[in-house]
């Protein structure tokens, strides 16, 4: 029931970390869209494990195989089915997790809720599930590209190291020039050094991703319970390890007066615009035509390669030192996931908007 995301553009995902594969079925994708499978694969490659010394060493090709809904390079309007086969599972690395619960992981809650859990890499709770989101998000990006809408995310903070400027202060073309996916080369090196240091200690660290959506038309959003920022927040907080979401000035707005926070309108050659964009491109839950920007906070990954106190499945106190291949920081690989969830949300709400008037 809750393995599906979206209203009109709708993804249903399936698969587990150490199962045979991860895939999905997409309903509501418009017909006639040229499907650039190379682009879809490039998006998956940005999420793929083993892409740098900062990420998990698990080696997966993550080659997407489309099963339906595409004919002669174009979408047919029928459900698009796809799968990515798992090829490099090391399930024995998780044998020591079968009888114990990892602190702050989904192990305990899954077991209590369902009475059973897949301890191999976390099963369905693994971030490997996000493969399906990246594929669907890549297709959504292809559709949005025809509408002049672009979505870009980047790492803006790792631990205490953060970018002080806004997205407009940086050359976003530099994001893919470093392993951290940060548009500031100097800060990127500091962030990478910190992640590498933490990884060497067997620990993990969190941080923040910033995302900006450009070219979004006025009018996307469905008040009162379908506000665009609420939909984006729901999308982002469904991502593994995501802990907080803010858009526009967010919490910074607490320190501002209304006269400072308000985005004053003006007439720009017949087009109504605002001098500022503290609202983050959304007013009253509806896009106003300005850039939409938001931030997503990710916690440190729960699986540590150092000893921690925990309990076993019988409730007896014990200790755990995880084995296996794990990321020390989720942020570099989460960039395409955040973009994908944003793309799916915007396309879905664009299609929803077409139902409001005859």
Curated annotation (Swiss-Prot):
The keyword NADP applies. FMN binds at residues 124-126, 240-241, 284, 299-303, 325. Pathway: Metabolic intermediate biosynthesis; chorismate biosynthesis; chorismate from D-erythrose 4-phosphate and phosphoenolpyruvate: step 7/7. Its EC number is 4.2.3.5. Pfam families: Chorismate_synt. NADP(+) binds at residue 47. InterPro entries: Chorismate_synth (IPR000453), Chorismate_synth_AroC_sf (IPR035904), Chorismate_synthase_CS (IPR020541). It catalyses: 5-O-(1-carboxyvinyl)-3-phosphoshikimate = chorismate + phosphate. GO terms for cellular component: cytosol. The keyword NADP applies. GO terms for biological process: amino acid biosynthetic process; aromatic amino acid family biosynthetic process; chorismate biosynthetic process. PANTHER family: CHORISMATE SYNTHASE. Belongs to the chorismate synthase family. This is Chorismate synthase. The lineage of its organism: Bacteria, Pseudomonadati, Bacteroidota, Bacteroidia, Bacteroidales. The gene is aroC.
